[in-house]
Amino acid sequence: MATSAAVRDDEPATKFAKDQLKSIIERIERLEEEKKAISDDIRDVYAESKGNGYDVKALRTIVRMRKQDPNERAEAETILETYMQALGMI
C-alpha cells in the first residue's frame, strides 16, 4: 500500500542517493579486489622467502614487531622475559 508521502524512484534526490550508494558499493568491491591481490602478493613473497631458506614464522614475527611502537615492543619483551625466567625457561 503506497502512501502519498512515498518517495518516487524518479525524483532527483532519490536518483542521487541511488547513484551515490552504487558508487560506494563499487568502490568497496574494487578495494576488496585490490586487498585480495595484495594478500596474494604477500603470500607469494613469503613462499619465495621459504624457497630461499628463510623461516617464514620468524619473518612474520619481525614484520609484526616492526609495526609496533618501540616502547610497546620493549615493554612486551620485558614482560615475556620475566615470565620465561619465572618458568625457568631462561
Swiss-Prot record:
Pfam family, one: GapR_DNA-bd
One MF annotation (Gene Ontology) recorded for this entry: DNA binding
Annotated InterPro entries: GapR-like, GapR-like_DNA-bd
Cysteines engaged in disulfide bonds, as pairs: none
Domain of life: Bacteria
Family note: Belongs to the UPF0335 family.
HAMAP family xrefs: UPF0335
Official protein name in the record: UPF0335 protein bsl7135
Organism: Bradyrhizobium diazoefficiens (strain JCM 10833 / BCRC 13528 / IAM 13628 / NBRC 14792 / USDA 110)
